[in-house]
């Protein structure tokens, strides 16, 4: 028996076996040969060989692909069909007297070396008339080994992503289980016993939002004598006079507010917080980035949790000032909502570790100092300190129902830069902290596994790029093998990977907006595409972190956008203009245009939703980056003149 060297163009060989009604009468074998997309194969030689005797029957499939062996002796037969361009099809069939046997067989054929080698056997080009709708069998061919390599790589990567998909399902399950377990303070501070709080405002070139931030912080509802405000400014532009003037204005009104300017930016944000902590007098440290606008009752909502001396940090949920400004800001809001609703809630309420998000959180001073203080060997100083503090035994509280509004980036390059910094920082923290976490005998296995998935999740970015590159070769394999033969593997993998993402965002939006969440559902395809759009910048971040490449803390530009009509930000300073990455994204856009065409041309329609997610993601990222960059450059030049 000749073993097929490889799976290639799949033929569905459907055989209807009819045994003789009586033992005395010979049996017959009837069947049809059908190409995997439904075209019947004519002119193929079919041989039936009796395994118990030298008896051999031979026939040829007719114009409609059917064949018949009449007067066949009962017994065990091997059916063989073989011709140019088709791998030898072999199957065993048992023909018994007094029984009518039916069997379905699937046969594999090799891809022809000539495009027309199989074409002539398709009945539609001969007896049925007309031309073969698919043209030649395939204009794109791979050799045997390439097929195997691509399939192993493809399903291997999808398998890894599916593991993270299972983890995502677990987060959703934990959220649904614990979402009603709202944390309560151990007790409450009496008004006369309220502790002193220091509010730190780290700034770097925030000329458009610095004054807004300072104005909102001085209006916090807390005894003025117990509130210290530090403006920690590393700026090198007009932010310096703007921020210092705002500080002087409120200092003259009797507020305990001070302005601290550094010229060297040593340690970036972590360095500024570290320097400010040494000069602060508060027992508790509340931190806000420049894009936040805290509500007056912000401190009151968090301070009472510190009546429990084991609590080291209280984190509040982020909400969004400009979520409805554009498609980009809406998608960002949905992505951040899922993190703060699903991830932070599930981790905090099931006894696991979770991290301070860098802003809108309050720290106990001792928790910072006893855990080693602010360190700046990673770009995620907030996550780094969070893990060190929790390993020291400090407990954290997450307040899902208490939110602090913030401005979302409205520019694509700024958004990608922000996500790159976050991705690189988390991987750096993983390299630094995961060995300590796994060696700690006090931590249960579930906590260790939780932190492994949390700190390695960004490794998916380079894997998704590899999937993007091999999408077309995989389509060729699908075409030549038949889609449904691989579909058995696709269904469970896609259920765990792709469907888990949809469930993840759906549950978070439904929780936050129970009456209007359906309005967000139309954005889910764009959310998934945005995840694809970030793969290049995030993959670079991951690789840099893994090989130890150091980079500065690149701030995310903020422009003070709060309403739909505000387009003045397009000509403001800080407008990032990057050309190399959008050009790569354009190249991949063209690649996926061709891949989509190939899928349509080959009738592999079931893959189109996934291909369109890639296409939309890369196209949107590239076009927005280039268009916004050119508009910003033109307006900036006009303003400069």
Residue ranges and their predicted role:
Residues 50-66, 70:
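Short, acidic Ser/Thr/Gly-rich low-complexity loop/linker segments typical of extracellular
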Residues 171-226:
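N-terminal signal-anchor transmembrane helix
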Residues 175-182, 188-191, 457-552, 558, ...:
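Membrane-embedded multi-pass helical conduit in multi-pass membrane proteins
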Residues 30-41:
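Structural motif
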């Amino acid at each position: 028996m000749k073993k097929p060297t490889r799976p290639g163009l799949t033929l569905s060989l459907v055989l209807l076996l009819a045994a003789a009604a009586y033992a005395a009468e010979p049996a017959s074998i009837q069947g049809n040969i059908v190409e995997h997309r439904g075209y019947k194969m004519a002119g193929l030689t079919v041989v039936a060989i009796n395994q118990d005797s030298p008896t051999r029957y031979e026939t040829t499939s007719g114009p409609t692909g059917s064949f018949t062996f009449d007067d066949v002796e009962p017994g065990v037969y091997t059916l063989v069909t073989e011709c140019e361009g088709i791998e030898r099809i072999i199957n065993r069939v048992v023909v018994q007297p007094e029984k009518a046997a039916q069997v379905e067989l699937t046969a594999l054929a090799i891809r022809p070396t000539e495009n027309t080698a199989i074409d002539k056997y398709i009945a539609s080009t001969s007896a049925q008339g007309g031309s073969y709708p698919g043209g030649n069998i395939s204009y794109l061919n791979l050799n045997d080994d390439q097929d195997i390599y691509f399939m192993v790589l493809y399903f291997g990567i999808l398998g890894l992503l599916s593991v993270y998909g299972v983890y995502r399902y677990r987060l959703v399950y934990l959220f649904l289980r614990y979402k009603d377990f709202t944390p309560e303070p151990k007790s409450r501070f009496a008004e006369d016993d309220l502790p002193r709080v220091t509010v730190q405002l780290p700034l770097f070139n925030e000329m458009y939002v610095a004054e807004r931030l300072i104005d909102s912080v001085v209006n916090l509802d807390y005894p003025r004598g117990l509130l210290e405000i530090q403006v920690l400014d590393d700026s090198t532009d007009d932010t310096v006079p703007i921020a210092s003037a705002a500080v002087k204005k409120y200092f003259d009104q009797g507020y305990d507010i001070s302005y601290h300017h550094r010229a060297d930016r040593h340690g970036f944000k972590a360095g500024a917080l570290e320097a400010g902590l040494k000069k602060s007098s508060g027992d508790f440290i509340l931190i806000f980035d420049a894009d936040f606008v805290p509500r007056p009752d912000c401190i009151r909502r968090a301070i009472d949790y510190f009546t429990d001396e084991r609590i080291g940090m209280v984190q509040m949920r982020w909400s969004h000032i400009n979520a409805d400004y554009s498609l980009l800001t809406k998608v960002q809001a949905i992505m951040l909502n899922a993190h703060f609703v699903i991830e932070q809630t599930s981790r905090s309420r099931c006894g696991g570790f979770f991290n301070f998000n860098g802003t809108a959180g309050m720290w106990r001073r001792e928790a910072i100092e006893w855990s080693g203080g602010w360190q700046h060997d990673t770009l995620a100083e907030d996550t780094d300190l969070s893990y060190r503090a929790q390993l020291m035994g400090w407990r954290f509280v997450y307040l899902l129902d208490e939110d602090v509004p913030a401005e979302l980036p409205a520019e694509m390059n700024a958004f990608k830069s922000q996500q790159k910094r976050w991705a690189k920082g988390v991987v750096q923290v993983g390299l630094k902290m995961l060995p300590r976490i796994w060696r700690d005998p006090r931590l249960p296995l579930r906590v260790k596994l939780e932190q492994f998935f949390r700190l390695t999740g960004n490794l998916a970015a380079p894997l998704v790029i590899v999937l993007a590159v091999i999408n077309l070769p995989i389509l060729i394999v699908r075409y030549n093998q038949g889609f449904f033969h691989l579909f058995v593997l696709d269904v469970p993998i896609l259920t765990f990977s792709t469907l888990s993402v949809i469930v993840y965002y759906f549950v978070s939006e439904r929780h936050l907006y129970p009456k209007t969440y359906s309005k967000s559902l139309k954005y889910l395809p764009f959310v998934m595409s945005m995840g694809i759009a970030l793969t290049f910048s995030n993959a670079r971040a991951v690789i840099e972190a893994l090989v130890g490449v150091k980079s500065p803390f690149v701030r995310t530009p903020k422009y003070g956008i709060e309403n739909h009509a505000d387009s003045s930000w397009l000509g403001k300073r800080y407008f990032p203009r990057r050309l190399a990455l959008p050009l790569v994204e354009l190249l991949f856009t063209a690649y996926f245009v061709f891949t989509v065409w190939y899928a349509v041309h080959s009738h592999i329609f079931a893959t189109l939703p996934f291909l369109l997610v890639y296409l939309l993601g890369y196209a949107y990222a590239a076009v927005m980056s280039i268009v916004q960059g050119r508009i910003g450059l033109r307006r900036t030049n006009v303003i400069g003149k």
